[in-house]
């Protein structure tokens, strides 16, 4: 265990977190494509540490519904405030970008839009539909906000039939007031539960970040809660602080602990578990579709 000094969260990263940036012309080509189509990605907006690696392999996680979130989670680098109006042409442009990139597994996420009556569910559905038309053989994964628990909003997404529905619980319930003050742990579990009730053929997925003060026992309890609502896929990664104004890092979790979490997850019955320091919700997301769903 490597812990950060109390009150700083700035201890030097351990060796297992040192990462060499890839050298590839595809990084700039991917950035230009996204800029030309006026698209946001969570890779850029959330300052993801895997951005260079993903762009080098010509993949990206599209972020729809603007670049401004109505919530202010303490771990997240996405800007918060008053969001802009919905861009009705965005689904078409997302599909065009995915087609040009030649994606076989497309991941779409969004900011939280509590200002919209449906939370943006209709825009998710429109994006899924556009992707189906542009890339009939692609696997489509959506990572959504909680839509304030609205079953009608979730039903709109379910009717569009994504292959994977992802909603992250992010952390253990004890830490929600500090980490996700505007969210609710039980509501997030219920979102995953409702999606399975609406369409049992849609794979459900959730993710946790560790290193924010949780215990191993608390992580296992969350994993058990996720299995209780029939969650199929789990990701666990190290929280890395985007800036000094964000949530402090309490611990750098060693690789062997991630291996242990992955083994426990498989024992609990998850179809697929990705756990590691740099694992994020959509990092190497296509591995599930290849290994479990048979998409080549």
UniProtKB/Swiss-Prot annotation:
Binds 2 [4Fe-4S] clusters per subunit. One cluster is coordinated with 3 cysteines and an exchangeable S-adenosyl-L-methionine. Pfam families: Radical_SAM. Transmembrane segments: none annotated. GO terms for cellular component: cytoplasm. Pathway: Protein modification; protein lipoylation via endogenous pathway; protein N(6)-(lipoyl)lysine from octanoyl-[acyl-carrier-protein]: step 2/2. [4Fe-4S] cluster 1 binds at residues 43, 48, 54, 282. It is found in: Cytoplasm. Residues 55-271 form the Radical SAM core domain. GO terms for molecular function: 4 iron, 4 sulfur cluster binding; lipoate synthase activity; metal ion binding. Keywords: 4Fe-4S, Cytoplasm, Iron, Iron-sulfur, Metal-binding, S-adenosyl-L-methionine, Transferase. Its EC number is 2.8.1.8. Gene3D superfamilies: Aldolase class I (3.20.20.70). It catalyses: [[Fe-S] cluster scaffold protein carrying a second [4Fe-4S](2+) cluster] + N(6)-octanoyl-L-lysyl-[protein] + 2 oxidized [2Fe-2S]-[ferredoxin] + 2 S-adenosyl-L-methionine + 4 H(+) = [[Fe-S] cluster scaffold protein] + N(6)-[(R)-dihydrolipoyl]-L-lysyl-[protein] + 4 Fe(3+) + 2 hydrogen sulfide + 2 5'-deoxyadenosine + 2 L-methionine + 2 reduced [2Fe-2S]-[ferredoxin]. The keyword rRNA-binding does not apply. Its cofactor is [4Fe-4S] cluster. InterPro entries: Aldolase_TIM, Elp3/MiaA/NifB-like_rSAM, Lipoyl_synth, rSAM. Belongs to the radical SAM superfamily. Lipoyl synthase family. This is Lipoyl synthase.
């Amino acid at each position: 265990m490597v812990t950060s000094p109390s009150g700083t969260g700035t201890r030097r990263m351990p060796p297992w977190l040192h990462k060499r940036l890839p050298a590839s012309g595809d990084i700039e080509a991917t950035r230009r494509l996204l800029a030309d189509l006026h698209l946001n990605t969570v890779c850029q907006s959330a300052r993801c540490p895997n951005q260079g690696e993903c762009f080098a392999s010509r993949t990206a996680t599209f972020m729809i519904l603007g670049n401004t979130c109505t919530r202010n989670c303490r771990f997240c680098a996405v800007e918060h405030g008053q969001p802009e109006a919905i861009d009705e042409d965005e689904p078409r442009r997302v599909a065009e970008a995915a087609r040009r990139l030649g994606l076989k597994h497309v991941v779409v996420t969004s900011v939280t839009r509590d200002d919209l009556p449906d939370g943006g569910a209709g825009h998710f559905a429109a994006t899924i539909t556009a992707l189906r038309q542009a890339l009939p053989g692609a696997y489509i994964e959506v990572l959504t906000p909680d839509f304030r628990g609205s079953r009608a909003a979730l039903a709109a997404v379910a009717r569009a039939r994504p292959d994977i529905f992802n909603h992250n619980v992010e952390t253990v319930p004890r830490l929600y007031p500090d980490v996700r003050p505007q969210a609710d742990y039980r509501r997030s579990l219920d979102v995953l539960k409702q999606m399975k009730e609406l369409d049992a053929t849609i794979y459900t997925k959730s993710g946790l970040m560790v290193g924010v003060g949780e215990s191993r026992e608390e992580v296992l309890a969350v994993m058990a809660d996720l299995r209780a609502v029939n969650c199929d896929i789990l990701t666990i990664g190290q929280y890395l602080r985007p800036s000094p104004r964000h949530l402090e890092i309490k611990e750098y979790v060693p690789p062997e602990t991630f291996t242990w979490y992955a083994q426990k997850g498989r024992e609990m019955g998850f179809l697929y578990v990705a756990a590691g320091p740099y694992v994020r919700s959509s990092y190497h997301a296509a591995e599930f579709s290849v290994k479990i769903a048979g998409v080549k």
